[in-house]
Amino acid sequence: MIKPMLAQDFQKDLSQRKIEKYAEDNDKFFVQPKLDGIRVIADLATGNLYKRSGVEVTNCPHLNGTVLELGLLIPGYEFVDGELYNHSLDFSDINSLVSRTVNILDTECIQLHLFDMSGEDIFEIRNLVLRKAINKLPLFSKMKNSSIYSVETYGLESMDDVLAKHKVFIENGYEGTMLRLNHLPYENKRSNQLYKIKDFTDSEFKIVGWNEEENHPGYLGSFEVADGVGNTFAVRPAVTREIRKEYWEDRISLINDKLTVRYQEKSKDGIPRFPIGIDIRYDLKEAKKYDPKPDIPINDTSFHRGW
């Protein structure tokens, strides 16, 4: 199984120190828009596509042949790294199509957007080799309309430039920004050369129920919350086990209290995506009962899909 390179969280203090250290000796950052698709590794020897979990994607046959042809243009390289994506579709639509087992011809709208590849060179060189090969595909391939694209990449000189470009990516409908440092080869692990930058929203939702921790009776697993327009969803609070136990013991008294939820965005159905509970707002007449003391950073997205 080929393991992809995974990103660090840009907002963590350790990440900031790593980036500052890099900037002392280097004067170039690379950024790409963060796509909201399905992360895949494409094997250049076989044309096969594999999700991060190692599961093969078998219902996008329109891509397999072109991956093989791409491999012929860059002999000696093992794989390319990207996402199954279409900027006109949201993630739920993409996921539904990629998971389809019937009517797979309908998946031809799914494109392969590539942002990196295997190799011992630094990112700038890997990216150049990849883009040149992709640009040759329409001439090389028998397919007139290729479904493989290179993700737009920008070389920038400062973090101010990076954050300005991040704002542009968000305005253009992307999920965020991938920041790449330019001093290491491709790494099949969570790497200190790759960082994801995302914006978050905090909103309050009414607690209407609860779920016990699976395999750990007596501890809260998640709250069920409502948004006031008919949607309910589960949110796991980012607190210590001790406080999850207290939440479970006090679960009845917490009904109708407000849970502050941090999330990336809402789905087309209006449900927050990747929600994390960060605080409970009690009646203002009462003293705050719990200090959240998260056991995971509330900005940590390392458990999120793909990266």
Regions found by a protein language model. Name each.
Residues 1, 152-201, 212:
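Amphipathic alpha-helical
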Residues 1-25, 31:
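Charged, flexible boundary elements
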Residues 13-20, 93-99, 156-163:
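Short, motif-level signal for alpha-helix interfacial/capping segments enriched in acidic residues
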Residues 19-143, 306-307:
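Covalent nucleotidyltransferase
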Residues 24-27, 35-38, 108-109, 171-174, ...:
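Short, well-ordered loop/turn elements at secondary-structure boundaries
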Residues 32, 38-82, 186-307:
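Classical nucleotidyltransferase
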Residues 82-84, 114-119, 134, 152-155, ...:
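Short, structured patches in soluble enzyme cores that scaffold and shape functional sites
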Residues 145-160, 263-265:
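Acidic carboxylate-rich catalytic motifs and surrounding loops in phosphoryl-/glycosyl-chemistry enzymes
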